[in-house]
């Protein structure tokens, strides 16, 4: 049986070196062995995000948020995944929460505002002229 810490460490090293596809392999194994570990799931979410597997990444970040509802980074990443899946209305809540938790993070506010702007035209009423 593989050691969870070894898998996690190897995955994080690959992630740090920009080898996102390769990082997903040991991180997925580590997650399967320790599904309750927020740090493993966050790292796996990052690897999946960078390989444009946004649906899978969103599931990992959602698992982190379920355990730690005030984890601003996981909220932000969840929101970004939802945006990139075209689910702007759903992205608004986690992005707004992340921006509220860390008001100095201008990137959080930027993507929160973009999600809101993407939704607004869909809800705008046509002029009665």
Please name every model-derived segment.
Residues 17-29, 51-63, 85-97, 119-128:
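Structural signature of tandem alpha-helical TPR/SEL1-like repeats
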Residues 1-6, 126-128:
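TPR-adjacent "capping" and linker segments in tetratricopeptide-repeat scaffold/adaptor proteins
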Residues 62-84:
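Mid-chain, well-packed structural core segment of small domains
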